[in-house]
């Protein structure tokens, strides 16, 4: 113990101490892809809209910032479809309860199922997020919105969130006049990151990328 204390003291003298400040530490929880559809939706119909979050929800909510990459749109009238060949996904608006219980602060929209029920349904889902105070990035009402960074500050640290989708298909990507995910473009992402750093808009830049179906 004495040797460790001596080592720590000498290390501090050599490096000039530490810049660690507990008051500025931020816990960021990023879950990866969420899709409340098919078998998950079936279980939610049986056990309630908060079922997926009953165990993990409080843990996620304890973070300073909680992020969900939500793969599918919220669609009024969405029906549970368990068919193995069904690849058109949606979630009932009531399923938002699981995200609320999980303390979700930010929604990543880099998935390729946002437009499965059409562009109008995708727009309605975006409006639903806004109505419930959930900011989105990596997707949006059009290409400009999809590529726009989302900024958030926690405990004195400024974060910038960006996202894009490499996999497609093309109807899943946002254009100048339709919603969707941001189509991966290294040039756009690189320029955006440079701009953020040059303008000192964030301390940490996080980029979410959906590659293939992962």
Descriptions of predicted regions:
Residues 2-214:
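Acidic, metal/ion-coordinating pockets
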């Amino acid at each position: 113990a004495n040797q460790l204390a001596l080592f720590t003291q000498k290390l501090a003298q050599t490096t000039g101490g530490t810049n660690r400040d507990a008051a500025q530490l931020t816990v960021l929880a990023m879950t990866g892809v969420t899709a409340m559809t098919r078998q998950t939706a079936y279980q939610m119909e049986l056990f309630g809209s908060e079922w997926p979050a009953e165990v993990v929800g409080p843990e996620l909510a304890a973070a300073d910032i909680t992020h969900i990459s939500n793969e599918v749109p919220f669609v009024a009238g969405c029906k549970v479809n368990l068919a193995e060949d069904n690849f058109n996904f949606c979630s009932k608006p009531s399923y938002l309860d699981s995200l609320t219980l999980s303390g979700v602060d930010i929604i990543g929209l880099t998935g390729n199922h946002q437009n499965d029920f059409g562009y109008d349904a995708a727009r309605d889902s975006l409006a639903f997020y806004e109505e419930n105070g959930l900011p989105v990035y990596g997707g949006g009402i059009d290409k400009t919105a999809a590529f726009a960074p989302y900024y958030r500050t926690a405990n004195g640290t400024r974060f910038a969130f960006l996202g894009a989708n490499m996999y497609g298909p093309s109807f899943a990507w946002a254009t100048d006049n339709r919603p969707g995910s941001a189509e991966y473009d290294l040039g756009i992402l690189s320029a955006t990151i440079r701009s953020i750093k040059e303008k000192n808009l964030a301390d940490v830049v996080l980029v979410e990328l959906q590659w293939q179906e992962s």
